[in-house]
Amino acid sequence: MANIGIFFGTDTGKTRKIAKMIHKQLGELADAPVNINRTTLDDFMAYPVLLLGTPTLGDGQL
């Protein structure tokens, strides 16, 4: 298991695309991105470092 977990939420797929780009740059340091809808607390706790990607609406509102 890698040291970095990448988790994302997406409405249109753009956040997933960015998560995959980040994963590619980090290589073996990070596991493959996971949609937060398929995640449990134990999944988060498995990593010492988390990267969380969230979608925005309109002009960047969360």
UniProtKB/Swiss-Prot annotation:
This is Flavodoxin. InterPro entries: Flavodoxin, Flavodoxin/NO_synth, Flavodoxin_CS, Flavoprotein-like_sf. Keywords: Electron transport, Flavoprotein, FMN, Nitrogen fixation, Transport. GO terms for molecular function: electron transfer activity; FMN binding. It comes from the Bacteria. It comes from Klebsiella oxytoca. The gene is nifF. Belongs to the flavodoxin family. The keyword Transferase does not apply. SUPFAM superfamilies: Flavoproteins (SSF52218). Residues 4-62 form the Flavodoxin-like domain. One of its GO terms (biological process) is nitrogen fixation. Gene3D superfamilies: 3.40.50.360.
